[in-house]
Each structure stands twice: as structure tokens, then as C-alpha cells.
Amino acid sequence: MSERNDRKVYVGRVVSDKMDKTITVLVETYKTHKLYGKRVKYSKKYKTHDENNSAKLGDIVKIQETRPLSATKRFRLVEIVEESVII
């Protein structure tokens, strides 16, 4: 059971929900430059499994690492933290 707790958990924004049962999540992280101490922003996109197609474009979601579900999917949707506001 402790193995499951070692899996990576990220919070990011949904940038694509066009695929069936799959969303693309943009995760932004900050790292400090060793020499200059400036914070540098890094971003990466993850394909994420969304079983019920519940996440929509612009939502803030929490994703967790899991076994490989396809050639590119390695994460699954845990929860929708904040829903996007549609104007």
C-alpha cells in the first residue's frame, strides 16, 4: 500500500479535452537557478486518463501517476480542484 503513496501528484490546468476519456494537463513548476537564485518557470503537458469525461477546458485538476494506460498516458485524474468559469 505504501507504493501507491510514493506516486507523483501534480496540480495543473486542462488545456485540451477533445479526446475521449483523455485530457491534456499543463503543469507549471518553479525551480531556483543554482548560481543566480532567480526562480525559473518550467511547464510540461501530461496526457491524463479521465474515465467519465468530467474535466472541461480550463479546469484546475489534480492528477496522479499510475501504470501505463497507453503509449502516452501515465497519469489519471484524481479530482477537479476548481471548475472554469464559462463567460
UniProtKB/Swiss-Prot annotation:
The keyword Transcription regulation does not apply. Part of the 30S ribosomal subunit. InterPro entries: NA-bd_OB-fold, Ribosomal_uS17, Ribosomal_uS17_bact/chlr, Ribosomal_uS17_CS. Disulfide bonds: none annotated. Gene3D superfamilies: Nucleic acid-binding proteins (2.40.50.140). Pfam families: Ribosomal_S17. The lineage of its organism: Bacteria, Bacillati, Bacillota, Bacilli, Bacillales. One of the primary rRNA binding proteins, it binds specifically to the 5'-end of 16S ribosomal RNA. The keyword Ribonucleoprotein applies. Belongs to the universal ribosomal protein uS17 family. Keywords: Ribonucleoprotein, Ribosomal protein, RNA-binding, rRNA-binding. GO terms for cellular component: cytosolic small ribosomal subunit. CDD domains: Ribosomal_uS17. GO terms for molecular function: rRNA binding; structural constituent of ribosome. GO terms for biological process: translation. PROSITE patterns: RIBOSOMAL_S17 (PS00056). This is Small ribosomal subunit protein uS17.
